[in-house]
Amino acid sequence: MNRVVRVVLILLSIFIIAGCGQASQEDVKKELEEVVGDLTSYQTKAKMEMLTGETAQLYEIDLAYQSDHFYRVLMHNEGDEEGSQIILKNDDGVFVLTPALNKSFRFQSDWPSNASQPYLYHSLVADVLNDDQAEFKVTDQYYVFKTQTNYQHNKTLPIQEVYFDQDSLTPYLVKIYDADHNVAVEVTFEPFELGVEFEPNFFEVDANLTSGIFSLPVGLIEGEHSQSEFIVRYPTALMGAELSETAEFDREEGKRVVLTYQGEKEFTIVQDYNETAMVAVREPELSAGVPVHIGKTIGAMTDQSLTWSENGVDYYLASEQLTREEMIEVAQSMGQQMEK
């Protein structure tokens, strides 16, 4: 069926529901399933505010989707220009790119279907459809679902409210709550542009690394990426452990600091400061594990390790005793400079 005809039929069905009085929960769920099933492409912008740390983190997000599994998610954090990142999914896999540092990692992952993604249309609809106990209400402009979340590595954010625009059935607002029912994450969407025609290389790694998409120096870079002094950071979430040893090393690329914690749950944190930026685009590194959000950035998690980059520093957390949730908590607690 022609794409335009499909869109017209979907819009007609939405108007029919609206014209027959207040829509039921099952009516709206059925329409949501049909709408996302017929999507060929979309593009929109969103703002995501994360309130889980000591200070709120605000992201500007540019979202693009092309049927049936191509995604590009641009995440710009004004508080960390070098940390602005891109999540790509294409025929070659899932990638996390940090254009300012010429870094790219490839994951063997079923992202985004492996967990809730509060900024992705398909993921939000999947959460609604998969929760038989979801609560539903209708406001003047929105259909509102209150559902369980599916965060594999963070059980502290169990509930979300998703607001869908009544006219288009696209998401307008997402509120994610912690166990005390405080808003921990809030995502606000701009109107969606449907049926977008993208350039052939729009979802390719090299094109996104060298496009200057964040107005940052990417591609061929010479000299230092930062003039700031290397500051060793210490976690405040210690999980019953204490700092037992600090080791510092000089490397050709810069400095390395290794923090060893011993106690109830032992772990090690490595911090690598690279004084010289990479000089050319290189092939993506294959990263074990799955991509996860940790505060201001996206990291790679396995059962016994968590790696991430922030403010020009590469971090590696390793432990045989910490759970995945605990590793994320330790990593997030390193967001501020702390004394030993």
Stretches with model-predicted labels:
Residues 73, 174-176, 317:
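Beta-strand-dense domains in secreted/periplasmic systems and polymorphic toxin scaffolds
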Residues 2, 15-70, 132-133, 290-314, ...:
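N-terminal leader/targeting segments and the immediate start of mature chains
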